[in-house]
Structure formats: structure tokens, C-alpha cells
């Protein structure tokens, strides 16, 4: 009977061990991951969906302006001296309007942004500060004409002198609020035929930085008013219900799967997320690059994996922008399709390291870079006497991603807007200025998740830790049970095969007594 029970115990222990191995190697992890992934996919009843539709916290939108302190010297050919003023901090609120759902696990939406000035975070800076900056809109108009029809540049400049009030040189004295959102008034009143053509061109193309002035024959120029309280899109994005590892990928923008202005499928590809949501990361297949689609520059940008880092006591993957993202075609031949002739009359259109031509995207000869030309060509710095100093800590773009949920714990995007200052002999405002790339301002857009969400993530990671402990505990118990049952079976078999005779030792009664005949 003892042997039979031991064998049953051994069999049950083996089954228990097999179950423990299956659960430990596959089952527990899959059950927990499935529950976590159910919460991160964009299903209407998931936590992530609610937070994705309306961000639970505002983003920090910071603007740093390059104030020109030696205008007269620059007008005479001297190197610019710049003074960085900022940050002017705004709270950026984001909300999405759902338009519908696609057949391929996609969701269509419009994105609305709203900006509010944050005086506390801005410190002593106010929107009434008056600064001197490069005259972006004037130079954009003049350079466009100079590149396309140089013979008309003097005629158009006369019209621009009427369009822009108090146009003395290539610099603008302006209040911060007017430069950013309220707008600088451009008057189309006048009898100059060239002015009529210029205003007609603006009216027909209406660049993002221009808007029609209500009740008058003119326009307002501002850098960001087109972003405020207006919707962009529609975007079409994968929800991650069918495959959570595709969550957040943008598949189309404004109904297009490729940005046509670059004339090339590689440069025009729309891939990656909108930077607000990423898919979970497989620990055995960590992506070397992550992509985000940036409609403001009409392209996708990638960041490279650096390493694994801890943030807020949470293990994350840290990515930062690669120097090849804005590399010259000599360093990254794939970027050759971003080359467009506009930078100067005898330039092939392929810009220096660290620059991106925005003319095809914005309709104006703007050039993007990282702040202070970080990761750009050293040649760009030679143009300035002082005030431009790239610094990785201040000017890098990066993101920390939780691999379990894909949630961004902290991230910052930074971008600088520049325009060419070009010497044109027959234009009074430009006849003596040094030719070079002139920065106007740079932006920092980022956020760090609040403590409440940090705690949720820590709890998720703790749960995985508990599962790991439970896995090994279950395996240990199963192995001990198998060993114990195996020993019991072995001992039972030994008992059954033990020799039974008169000289044997009884484990119950003790040794038998043998009678000895001593004789007479």
C-alpha cells in the first residue's frame, strides 16, 4: 500500500512540475502582459484611450529667442552678437476629436492644441518684452523673389517697404506677444502694383505663419498663431488591438500615406508615432531606432537607442536624436531627397550638416536645425561673434520609454528655425550684411508624467516582480515535491525487496533472539 501511494504522489508531482514549468516559462508572463497590454491599447474602454484623447497634464512649450545686440555692426558687415532670451513658457493643452475607425485597426482623429502663457514658469520674462530679431517674413519674401526672378527683386522690395511698417533693415523690433501669437500687421493698402501682386500671392498661398486681418485689407504674421486653438489633421493611427506592438503608428496624414512635397518615397514616408504614444517594447527585440512623424516639418524623424536607464525607479529605454537625422547627403546619402535649391543662387540645395530645408513644407525659405546648430557643421558657428554655443545637455532631443507599457516617462523635442541673411547689393537693407544662416528662435516641447502615473507604472513593474518570485517559488515547490516523491518511491521499493528470514532484523519488533546450545 505504501509503494502504491508513493507512486501516485510521484506521478502527481511530475504533473505539477510540468505545469509549473509551463506557467513559469510562458503562462504567468503572458497572462500579466495580456492584462497590461489590454490597458495600453486604444480600445474605448482602456485607461490609455482616455489619457490619449485628452492629455492628463499640459506639455511645457518653451520658446528661446535670439535677440540681436549689434544691429548697426551687422548692417555694416560685422559678425552678429546674439543674446538668447528665454524660456518664455507656455502650457500646451492637447485634445483629440475622434472622426471614426478604419477596417485595419486604425483610428482617425483631429488634433487641437491650446496655449496659455505661464508667467510663473517664465520668471521675469513677459509677453510685453521688446526684442530685436531677424526679420523672418521680410527675408522670406525677398529671398523667394531673388531665387525665382532676381530681376524683379528691387521692384518687390519697394512693395515690401509698404507692406512692412518701419522697414529700416533686415531686423524687426517687436513685442514677444506679437511675434508669437497676436501677430504683426502687414498692410496691403497702397497704389503700388507690385504690392498688389505680393498681397495676392500671400492671399493665394497663405503660409501657416500668415492669417487674414479681419475687417481690413491686410494680414498678420506670427510664428505660432496657426497652432493655437486650431485643429490639424486628420491623422490615421493604428490602435494596437490586433497587434499591440504596432500601437501608435501613423499610417496617413490628411489622407496621404506619403508626404508628396519631397518627391521621394523615402523622404516622404510617414512612419512612427505622434510622439505621445509608443508601443510596448519586446525585451528580446528592442528597436534600435524609434520614429515620430512631425507634420510641422513634413517628415518623420528618428532617435537612436542609447542604453537602458532607470528613471523614477522604473527601468526604461533611453533614445536620443541621431546626428544622421539631419545629416548632409555626404554623411547620409538617404537624405539627398531633402535637397532643394533655395539657399543661395549658386548652391546645389543640399545643405550643410545638421540642417533641413523647410521650403517645400512651409512655402517659405525657412531652414530647421537643432538649437544652436547642435550636431551641425562647424562652419555654421563661424558666422557669429558670440551667442551661439551648442550644448548637448541643453539642446539634445530625447525620450525615456517604459518597455512594459510603451508610456513616455519623460521626453523633450527641440527645434530651431533659421533663415538666410543674404547680401544683395541693390537692396538698401541688405547691401552690406554678411551672408550666412541666421537663427530666429528655438522651441522646446516636452513633459514628464505626473507622480500618480509614475506610481501606476511602478505598481505594474512590481506586479511583474511578484510574478517572477511566484514563478521561481512554484518551480521550487514542484522540484522539491518530485524529489521527495522519488525518494519515497525508492524507499518503498527497497522495503518490498528486503530479504525476510530468521536472522533478519525486524524494523518493528527489533532483532530476533537465537537459542545457543551450550551442551552438557
Swiss-Prot record:
The keyword Transferase does not apply. Glycans are attached at residues 44, 67, 104, 228, 271, 313, 342. It is a multi-pass membrane protein. Keywords: Cell membrane, Disulfide bond, Glycoprotein, Membrane, Olfaction, Receptor, Sensory transduction, Transmembrane, Transmembrane helix. It is found in: Cell membrane. GO terms for cellular component: cytoplasm; plasma membrane. Disulfide bonds join 267-337, 298-361, 339-350. One of its GO terms (biological process) is sensory perception of smell. Residues 29-468 are extracellular. Residues 1-7, 490-520 are cytoplasmic. The chain crosses the membrane at residues 8-28, 469-489. Signal peptide: none annotated. InterPro entries: CD36_fam (IPR002159). The keyword Membrane applies. Belongs to the CD36 family. Plays an olfactory role that is not restricted to pheromone sensitivity. May play a role in the elimination of lipophilic components from the sensillum lymph. This is Sensory neuron membrane protein 2.
